[in-house]
């Protein structure tokens, strides 16, 4: 029964969040069971374009390291903030949400190559957190019961926490940079005098992914509900 409830609850999670989280968990499980090796997953331009190992363009965003505290920490934030974006500012706009992933993924891959970064899942997580935080500026965040601050400070708190764990902050900075570029092009520049939307979601994505109507049973997370 508990397993059935867990499965039913997971199926209630929005599609993009559900698919990305499941892919990350399954990839890590496959590495843990030695069905795959991290050396088969990391981004390597030579192997992608000369050996046609094109899956590396995707798997670089799916592997968050071996099973442990770092993995569960990252999955918690990926699941939470990906879901809040999908149920919040991207509600009813699944194609736009997927296009944000594609835009961010391409830009991170190019910049990550210049910086010799081989796994970019943490950068994608930082981008999701950054975009959510800029679109929810008045939400107060409780950071593990230790700190309480406005949402725009969250990406920097995560970067500081990563530094305390002894990790490099370059990947976090890459995600924040790409998140800011997306936020500027999508939310800031179009509202400037003479500005316009530059990131236009391809029609084929809208045709394939957007729902014809909203789910009448939709219930947003508490953070996304308007205050009375």
From Swiss-Prot:
Gene field: Derl3
**What processes in GO biological process is this protein linked to?**
endoplasmic reticulum unfolded protein response; ERAD pathway; negative regulation of retrograde protein transport, ER to cytosol; protein N-linked glycosylation via asparagine
* Stated role: Functional component of endoplasmic reticulum-associated degradation (ERAD) for misfolded lumenal glycoproteins, but not that of misfolded nonglycoproteins. May act by forming a channel that allows the retrotranslocation of misfolded glycoproteins into the cytosol where they are ubiquitinated and degraded by the proteasome. May mediate the interaction between VCP and the misfolded glycoproteins.
Listed GO cellular component terms?
endoplasmic reticulum membrane
- The answer to whether the entry has keyword Coiled coil is no
Q: Which protein family is named in the record?
A: Belongs to the derlin family.
Q: Which GO terms describe its molecular function?
A: signal recognition particle binding
Tissue specificity remark: Highly expressed in spleen, lung, liver, spleen and testis. Expressed at intermediate level in kidney. Weakly or not expressed in brain, heart and skeletal muscle.
Pfam families membership: DER1
Give the domain of life: Eukaryota
What cystine linkages occur within this chain? none
Kindly report every residue range on the membrane side named Lumenal: 44-57, 120-168
| Name of this protein | Derlin-3
Q: Where are the transmembrane segments?
A: 23-43, 58-78, 99-119, 169-189
């Amino acid at each position: 029964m508990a397993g059935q409830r867990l499965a039913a609850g997971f199926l209630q999670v929005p599609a993009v969040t559900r698919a990305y989280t499941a892919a990350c968990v399954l990839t890590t499980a496959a590495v843990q069971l030695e069905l795959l090796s991290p050396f088969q997953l990391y981004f390597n331009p030579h192997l992608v374009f000369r050996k046609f190992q094109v899956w590396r363009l995707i798997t670089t965003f799916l592997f968050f390291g071996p099973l442990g505290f770092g993995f569960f920490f990252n999955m918690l934030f990926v699941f939470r903030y990906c879901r809040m974006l999908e149920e919040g500012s991207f509600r009813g706009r699944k194609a736009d949400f997927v296009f944000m992933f594609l835009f961010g993924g391409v830009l991170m891959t190019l910049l990550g190559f210049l910086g010799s970064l081989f796994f970019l899942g943490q950068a994608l997580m930082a981008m999701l957190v950054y975009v959510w935080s800029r679109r929810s500026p008045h939400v107060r965040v409780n950071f593990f019961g230790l700190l309480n601050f406005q949402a725009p400070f969250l990406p920097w708190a995560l970067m500081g926490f990563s530094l305390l764990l002894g990790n490099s902050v370059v990947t976090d900075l890459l995600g924040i940079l790409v998140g800011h570029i997306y936020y500027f092009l999508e939310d800031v520049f179009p509202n400037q005098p003479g500005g316009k939307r530059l990131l236009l979601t391809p029609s084929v994505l809208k045709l394939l992914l957007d729902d014809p109507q909203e789910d009448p049973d939709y219930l947003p997370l508490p953070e996304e509900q308007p205050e009375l």
